[in-house]
Amino acid sequence: WFLDNFCFPVKEYYLKLGFDFIKESFDISGTEFIDKYMKRCHELQLHQGAIEILQYVKSLGIAQSLLSASSQVMLNEILSNHDINDYFKEILGTDNHYAYGKEALTRKWIEGLNYDAKEVLFIGDTIHDKDIANTIGSDCFLIPKGHVSRIRLEKTGAPIFDNLNELLQWFQNR
């Protein structure tokens, strides 16, 4: 059910779950979830092939950035457990834990780059990632290993890779 219904803004997903924000505000519900999530974030694992693709792309001299709808504080905490920060030129999260603001964050990021948006490749796992890539004029590849089902991702028209190893093979064969 989750993969077929999760969406941004996250508040809309909470409404699909049946939350009544008249009875309890989204600020309270969202904060309760994040507090519980952060207590277990050290348990999060990287997807199989994550290190290999980060290493390979870096070996090509291609700059990598990580942009997330997660808050910068949350992102820093999660990444501290994986020792992958050195692969990224920039690591950017939002200024809140409600997943608001990734589009504005991305616009600001792209304006600061010395690249044309057409030279940027977004790799994500949500429809929102594809929407943001479209907004800034970049290509986007999607991997159905996150919050959204493959069927929903296919509807975006973006190329779909089943996993990071498949994406790595694409890079190696280009």
Report each predicted region and the residues it spans.
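A short, structured active-site edge motif that brings together acidic residues
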Residues: 1-5, 85-100
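Glycine-rich phosphate-binding loop signature in dinucleotide/nucleotide-binding domains
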Residues: 60-62, 113-119, 174
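Surface-exposed amphipathic alpha-helices with a cationic face
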Residues: 51-58, 110, 130-134
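Short, acidic loop-to-helix structural element flanking the phosphoryl-transfer center
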Residues: 38-66, 72, 76, 103
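N-terminal helical cap/lid subdomain that shapes the substrate entry/recognition surface
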Residues: 1-48
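Conserved H-loop
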Residues: 84-89, 116, 161
